[in-house]
Amino acid sequence: MANNAELIKQCEERAQQWLTPAFDEETRNEVKAMLEAEDKSALVDAFYQNLEFGTGGLRGIMGAGTNRMNKYIVGMATQGFANYILKAFPGEENLSVVVGHDCRNNSRLFAETVAAIFSANGIKAYLFESLRPTPEISFAIRELGAKAGVNVTASHNPKEYNGYKAYWSDGAQVLAPHDTGIIEEVNKVTIDQVKFEANWDKIKIIGGEMDYDYMTAVHTAMIDQDVINRQKNLNIVYSAMHGTGRVIVPLCLRSWGFQNINVVPEQMVVDGNFPTVVSPNPENAEAMTLGMKLGTKLNADLVVATDPDADRLAIVCRDDKGEWMIINGNQTAMMFCYYIIENKKKLGKLKPTDFLVKTIVTTEVIAEIAKKNNVELRDCYTGFKWIAREIAISEGKQQYIGGGEESFGFLPYDKVRDKDAPASICLICEIAAWAKDQGKTLYDLLMQIYAEYGFSKEFTVNVVRPGKTGADEIKQMMADFRANPPKELGGSKIVTWKDYQSLEAKHADGSVEKLDMPTTSNVLQWFCDDNTKVSVRPSGTEPKIKFYIEVKDPSFKCAGCYNRCTAAAMDKIEAIKKSLNQD
């Protein structure tokens, strides 16, 4: 890496290019201030590299500069995407894309910029009239027969961030070969090649009709209308976390037959600054504080929330003492899979060709549920585009009935090809109604699943290593694990080592088998003789490496064992962290 003086000089030269008339006055003033400041750290951070358009699109802090989310970086990304679409469908007329956005600051500006550039390139842009949930954008791409789509969102990241997700014609985020093809085109674009001037004949505003069609599709995820009719007064508290679920989720719940829906008023206000939470992430208990407070006041049965772009959900239920308990992403996926199988079976709707999908880092309890019920379960890589791929390759042959991942994302039907929080919230409320119909809570149901299929405790360790030195360190950690794989984890003997880069599974008896995956991935997994599972993968979007630990306890027999088994599992997890030098 260049030394400090060299780096500052390079950044100053890059910044000077942003003082030309190609950039607006506001941008020029921001860059000027960075150039004139004595402290050059802001300048360096904004210009030391280009914000990378990766396989998931763009994500970064908003502001002026090559390493920031702004309309010029969004513009170059869109011009590259448009160039790729035109090459992918040569000579084809009436090409179209769908453009949507979330509640974040500048999201509307970026979405309008995207629509303008597509239209200027002769591609019709269906632009949503205002913010919409991510799953509705996926649905609209399929419904309108569009060739691609763009969603301006940074999901649950802090307020300083925004992002750009690229979708293909199936409504899923782009996979090979399109992902690398788009990246190649984006990397060729210079600012003077971007066609910013909109062709208004090629822009169509969409909204209400698509909302209705999407909500009609969500309705098809319902399994048992009768149980909802009996428990229509289930006491539900909902929070939109200042985002896109604010209108759609309550409407979907009412259309399913739920009549007692209470919203967290402070969090139904659209606000890209997310003033009521530290971080708008449903994985953080703090973000659910206001919902739980209202739930206590109203004596609610459960509290549910969506993240700002409404692709992920959070669920809070009452435990055996009546206290609020956050159901984690693995437990959520378990409950969905259990309920879908149990009730489709009971109602005669389960078919031999039905299948479920989970990511490789998600709990193996789902595998037990599927196995005991003779339902096919497929494992795929982390990221919902891989679940979408499994749906796509089986279309017309087998029926997808549900799939999810540990990071609070689930899709209970095949009308959408991304995580769908509105549909998932409706289904979890149906599950809560089903439990209540039997005099149980979601907590009781969770304990029942553990008793029947085995207890597991999952824990994720995030090791953050920022900057270039951090990236090198993460690379070295993975290389070391490959060169000298561990033999045991926290006292448990490893019996299988899986490497998704070489696509091999090596067993303790010396046998080797090929892993059946669509491509390679930089992931390692270790399985122990006591069913402990550890997965290691560097994050694709952040400077960190993740360790996903899953520990089993066969001694779990009933709800009374929960605290004991959880404590024992946490002790085991600490021992595993120690053996991996991550304590």
Segments predicted by a language model, with ranges:
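Short acidic, glycine/serine/threonine-rich loops at helix termini
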Residues: R108-T113, S138-R142, E160-A166, K195, ...
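An N-terminal, well-structured beta->alpha segment
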Residues: A5-V114, W200-I236, T244
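Glycine-rich phosphate-binding loop plus the immediately following alpha-helix
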Residues: Y167-K195, N330-D354, K358-A367, A421
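Phosphate-binding and adjacent anionic-ligand microenvironments
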Residues: T296, A300-L302, E323-M325, N343-R537, ...
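Gly/Ser/Thr-enriched, mixed-charge loops and adjacent short helices
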Residues: W18-A22, E26, A42-L51, N162-T289, ...
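N-terminal small/polar loop signature for handling phosphorylated ligands or for N-terminal nucleophile
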Residues: V98-Y161, Q259-I315
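Conserved phosphate/anionic-ligand binding catalytic regions in large, soluble enzymes, centered on
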Residues: F47-N67, A154-N157, A240-I248, C252, ...
